[in-house]
């Protein structure tokens, strides 16, 4: 199989089975592309993860774009991202059609009941493997712990990441660094797009597209941050959605596989049908392709300068700290009784002791969840 066809095959499959949000997506990519296929080493994977945390946009999608480029060049960059996004987009479009047609959402509580604890095990296993590579010495270990604590305390993700990078950079001997270029890249384009999208009025495809383009270009952080942006624009400023419609859209984005940014697909369908769904999806994801392509030349320079390399090391462990905080928060919601605790423990043991594909664990968890719900209906 050619590298490009391999990129298409891998990311189409991940786009179908990658439930659980960015942390779980990244864990699955590590298992498939580091452990199984050996496209990159753990050190390279962590560097890419650190770089995606410094630019706006959905981290897991940007990892797919980066990894596609490493495997198959420019076309791999484009198709890696597209193939990861398209399955989720099609699923969300189908759910949006059903929502409009019947005024409600298909019930998936049984599947999610069994899938969520398996996702927690997958994320923990990946985080352990990445931490063994990234956390080198007491300074970086301390940065990991502090980053996790700050994230749990509600400190903004961007402050945690740049703070950890800055502290790590300050403790190495003075050398010329290029870390400032990352910050410039992260803020220059979003400022222009934000200004361009500051328009209001009736529901028009142009206005909707510009709003989603702005969100994709400036948004750091979790799905909760996405919810805040969407509410400010579509509920409060433009008045195009109700709070209930927005919450339903976010729920669909969270329970379907692939990037949670496909919430935009659902909203686009509600506002302008099939055309709106496609335009909203393209607009919110397009900045990620631009940022990844623009930031790729920075990675060798970041690793080539000692201070900049230390900055990236700090960002990497802070990203893992954020991942730990998210896993703790998700785990409290996922492991709710003895059965879900047993599912999480069994999945963790299988992941550590065997090379079982996480897709089979997710399928087993979903089937057990459906059976349990059927017995207790």
PLM feature spans:
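Multi-pass membrane proteins that catalyze or facilitate reactions on polyprenyl-/lipid-phosphate substrates
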Residues: 1-55, 66-256, 260-377
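Conserved beta-loop-alpha segment that forms the PLP phosphate-binding cup at the N-terminus of a helix
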Residues: 59-62
